[in-house]
């Protein structure tokens, strides 16, 4: 083979290798969210998922070079969906508690919250009434508020079991609060603030729980965990982080 033909062959191979690299499929991850969890994740007026967490993971995906598909998933089935490989991560205001850590892994913490209690504007209910078990309380099933109420009020005989009302999502609990089916509603503080905005409801107090939000990932997906951790690090160091906090009124 002549030197000219050999050079031509090398050039062609280089082009083909470069082309195959350039057209390599971008990795896509399925992100499970709660579709009724403002300001973290909810369905916008255009029918598309949005929120603080949704925009955060979309920014991270672009920054780190992968794609995401946002899939609203029932909260009480979201970890089973993760374990069954139906989704690749949960990025939707999930508390990284010890019970969940037994079955899934978590990213670095990106937010800290407490629990807030809301009542109707005209209500005279107080935190003393709440702590004494005098109020029928609504919250979302499978969430930290439900666990706290069960462990600290129901199991101790302070709150009758029939006064703890569980819902598929917190907006449903807030709706029943508005129409008087429950006396109070309890949930993560920023969720309560976001949900009652513009409604005839008010916050009467908080329960200090110091929960930490993180992204849930299967224990075997260590590469994805590293990818998300690096993405979170870059996001929280970028102007986008403060922009998102301002957009979704994340200052308590």
Q: Predicted segment positions?
A:
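Bacterial N-terminal signal peptides
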Residues: 9-18
């Amino acid at each position: 083979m002549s030197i000219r033909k050999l050079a031509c062959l090398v050039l062609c191979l280089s082009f083909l290798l470069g082309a195959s690299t350039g057209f390599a499929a971008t990795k896509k991850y399925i992100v499970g969210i709660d579709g009724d969890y403002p300001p973290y994740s909810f369905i916008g007026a255009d029918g598309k998922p949005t929120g603080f967490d949704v925009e955060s993971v979309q920014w991270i995906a672009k920054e780190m070079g992968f794609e995401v598909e946002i899939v609203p998933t029932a909260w009480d089935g979201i970890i089973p969906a993760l374990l069954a490989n139906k989704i690749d991560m949960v990025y939707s205001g999930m508390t990284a508690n010890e019970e969940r850590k037994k079955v899934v892994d978590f990213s670095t913490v990106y937010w800290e919250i407490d629990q807030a209690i809301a009542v109707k504007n005209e209500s005279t209910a107080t935190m003393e009434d709440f702590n004494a078990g005098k109020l029928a309380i609504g919250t979302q099933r499978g969430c930290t508020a439900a666990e706290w109420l069960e462990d600290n009020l129901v199991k101790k005989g302070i709150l009758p079991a029939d006064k703890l009302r569980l819902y598929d999502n917190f907006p449903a609990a807030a709706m029943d609060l508005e129409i008087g089916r429950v006396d109070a509603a309890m949930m993560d503080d920023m969720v309560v603030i976001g949900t009652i905005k513009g409604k005839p409801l008010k916050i009467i107090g908080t329960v200090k729980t110091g929960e930490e939000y993180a992204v849930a990932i299967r224990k075997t997906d260590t590469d994805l965990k590293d990818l998300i951790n690096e993405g979170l690090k870059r996001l929280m160091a970028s102007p986008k982080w403060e922009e998102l906090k301002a957009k979704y009124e994340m200052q308590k």
